[in-house]
Amino acid sequence: MIGIDIVSIARIEKCVKRFKMKFLERFLSPSEIVLCKDKSSSIAGFFALKEACSKALQVGIGKELSFLDIKISKSPKNAPLITLSKEKMDYFNIQSLSASISHDAGFAIAVVVVSSSNE
């Protein structure tokens, strides 16, 4: 399954300026906030990545999957890594998750590919 999302970096920047940490804490863990280093483009990329993951799982963000259920980290080469708790991995029958984020022309775009044990 594949999920994709695109976000305006300016829109995220406006939300960060208006709501500050309250906005970030709604969808990012403390370690993810540190990884973003207060960069609007990184914050937008992480937001898009979590939305793309929810779309790949065909549930959206809501009761079955929250923003904070989705964990983002970085590889030694700075590539995004995405995971869910073991409970959510089992619930959605996920074998692996792959992710990519890109930024251009004021937008952040993210793609998530989910491989399930059923495939």
Swiss-Prot record:
It comes from the Bacteria. InterPro entries: 4-PPantetheinyl_Trfase_dom (IPR008278), 4-PPantetheinyl_Trfase_dom_sf (IPR037143), ACPS (IPR002582), Ppantetheine-prot_Trfase_dom (IPR004568). GO terms for cellular component: cytoplasm. GO terms for biological process: fatty acid biosynthetic process. It is found in: Cytoplasm. Its EC number is 2.7.8.7. Pfam families: ACPS (PF01648). Mg(2+) binds at D5, E51. Keywords: Cytoplasm, Fatty acid biosynthesis, Fatty acid metabolism, Lipid biosynthesis, Lipid metabolism, Magnesium, Metal-binding, Transferase. Its cofactor is Mg(2+). GO terms for molecular function: holo-[acyl-carrier-protein] synthase activity; magnesium ion binding. It catalyses: apo-[ACP] + CoA = holo-[ACP] + adenosine 3',5'-bisphosphate + H(+). HAMAP family: AcpS (MF_00101). Belongs to the P-Pant transferase superfamily. AcpS family. Transfers the 4'-phosphopantetheine moiety from coenzyme A to a Ser of acyl-carrier-protein. This is Holo-[acyl-carrier-protein] synthase.
